[in-house]
């Protein structure tokens, strides 16, 4: 079993991370969305170690992270005009673009496909790591496959202790949900996965109407398989039932509640109230799911949010978490 070290961002930890990556090892690092489990993007063997460490299906591609546009040109065949507009508007930030891959990117990273998912993360520590390495980093979320995504180093350690040698602890992730994913190969943006960057903002920056295909896409990481699921049962409830205190099952042993609206009834042993809009809910969601697990909750009642704006991404994750 690998000994796992947790270090704060520093010159020393950065040098250790680069040494590990150059030797074919894996490093978990913070981004503004969720923590990533990184390997050298041009190293097929290292990419396969990512899949093994996570227990990730091999048909689920990885996202390639770059620190600047110069690095991007080695990853993709061509930056389309649409991709250029979206990059200018949102990079560095929580937006992943689907483009045709270059010959340098191995099939182990793209699940054998001809396209690559690529983004420039909006977290200084992530970009510093990529810049120090001098090449892109392929990284899915740093959790066991199917589990809630990690938004703290403690979440990563809980899932991957003994599977990864180094975790860079950059504190809690600001956004708390994975990046939006957009197919930018054509003239119109195709939203393959919703994120905290809304579809409306993407359409405005693109200057073109967007398409949102139904179901999963083989091009997009994180849409094909079961994701975001804690060990406890997740039950989605509308705000009106929370405001009325009309959740009979909440009185049962092992029940918990995550909510925004005021709860007038007796609070269960595990209860998390998130104040603010859908963005605040997004930032707190995965931590709440993991905290409920740790508290021994068996049935977790989670208040829904309106299915618009950032709420689309929140509801996408909640529906997947509730799926059995």
Regions found by a protein language model. Name each.
Residues 1-324:
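Active-site-adjacent structural elements in enzyme catalytic cores
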């Amino acid at each position: 079993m690998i000994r796992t070290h947790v270090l704060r961002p520093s010159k020393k930890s950065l040098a250790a991370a680069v040494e590990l990556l150059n030797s074919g090892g894996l490093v978990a690092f913070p981004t503004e969305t969720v923590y990533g489990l990184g390997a050298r993007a041009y190293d097929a063997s290292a990419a396969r170690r990512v899949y093994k460490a996570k227990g990730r299906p091999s048909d689920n591609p990885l996202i390639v992270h770059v620190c600047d546009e110069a690095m991007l040109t080695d990853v993709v065949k061509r930056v389309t005009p649409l991709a250029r507009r979206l990059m200018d508007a949102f990079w560095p930030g929580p937006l992943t673009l689907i483009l045709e891959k270059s010959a340098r990117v191995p099939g182990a990273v793209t699940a054998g496909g001809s396209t690559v998912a690529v983004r420039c993360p909006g977290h200084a520590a992530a970009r510093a790591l990529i810049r120090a390495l001098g090449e892109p980093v392929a990284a899915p979320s740093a959790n066991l496959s199917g589990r809630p995504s990690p938004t703290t180093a403690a979440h990563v350690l809980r899932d991957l202790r003994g599977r990864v040698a180094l975790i860079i602890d950059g504190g809690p992730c600001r956004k708390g949900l994975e990046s939006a994913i957009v197919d930018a190969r054509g003239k119109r943006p195709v939203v393959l996965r919703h994120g905290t960057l809304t579809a409306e903002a993407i359409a405005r920056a693109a200057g073109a109407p967007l398409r949102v295909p139904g179901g999963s896409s083989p091009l997009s990481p994180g849409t094909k398989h079961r994701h975001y699921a804690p060990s406890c049962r997740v039950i989605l409830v509308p705000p009106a039932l929370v405001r009325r205190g009309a959740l009979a099952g909440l009185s049962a042993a092992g029940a918990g509640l995550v909510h925004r609206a005021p709860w007038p009834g007796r609070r269960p042993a595990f209860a998390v109230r998130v104040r603010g809009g859908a963005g605040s809910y997004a930032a707190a969601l995965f931590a709440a799911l993991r905290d409920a697990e740790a508290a021994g909750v068996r049935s977790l009642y989670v208040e829904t949010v309106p299915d618009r704006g950032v709420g689309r991404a929140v509801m996408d994750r909640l529906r997947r978490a509730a799926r059995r």
